Amino acid sequence: MAQLKVTQTRSTIGGKQNQRETLATLGLGRIGKSTVQEDTPGVRGMIRVVAHLVSVEEVDES
């Protein structure tokens, strides 16, 4: 299964509570922090909620 590298690029100050919780669920919390997530519909949905706060790249599995 493909993997996605999710990097937080913007702050959550002034953001909604559900956006902060979604970032925490993705393992983010500071600008510049990155995590690698499996490419599943659930993760894609979480990324959609915080799309304006993160950048996403596909990661090679090899």
From Swiss-Prot:
Record GO biological process: translation
Pfam family, one: Ribosomal_L30
UniProt entry tagged with the keyword ATP-binding: no
GO CC annotation: cytosolic large ribosomal subunit
Subunit and partners: Part of the 50S ribosomal subunit.
PANTHER family listed in its UniProt record: LARGE RIBOSOMAL SUBUNIT PROTEIN UL30M (PTHR15892:SF2), MITOCHONDRIAL RIBOSOMAL PROTEIN L30 (PTHR15892)
NCBIfam families attached to this UniProt entry: rpmD_bact
Name by which UniProt lists this protein: Large ribosomal subunit protein uL30
UniProt organism field: Beutenbergia cavernae (strain ATCC BAA-8 / DSM 12333 / CCUG 43141 / JCM 11478 / NBRC 16432 / NCIMB 13614 / HKI 0122)
Taxonomic path: Bacteria, Bacillati, Actinomycetota, Actinomycetes, Micrococcales
